Amino acid sequence: MTPKQYAYYSLNNLKEYKCLASLYGKESAWNHNAYNASSRAVGIPQGKSIWLLTATPIQQTEWGLRYIKHRYSTPCKAYDHWKAKGWH
């Protein structure tokens, strides 16, 4: 299973998946090795947890979904924040 498939099945909502796909597409291009030197964010969700450095792509996606749920409640709200501020 790919990280995109995992996210789609975890969300079970096409609208929310599209928001997440857009957000992660812009943040990391769904690259589990992505690294932002200026913010030190890593992985698919561009998180600042050192744990993400050794996590699998699926684990990174799961971490990102939990983060979004805790901070924004939905991927669409997280993506709206990203569009307004340039970060999430």
Where are these regions (language model features)?
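Peptidoglycan cell-wall recognition and remodeling modules
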Residues: 1-88
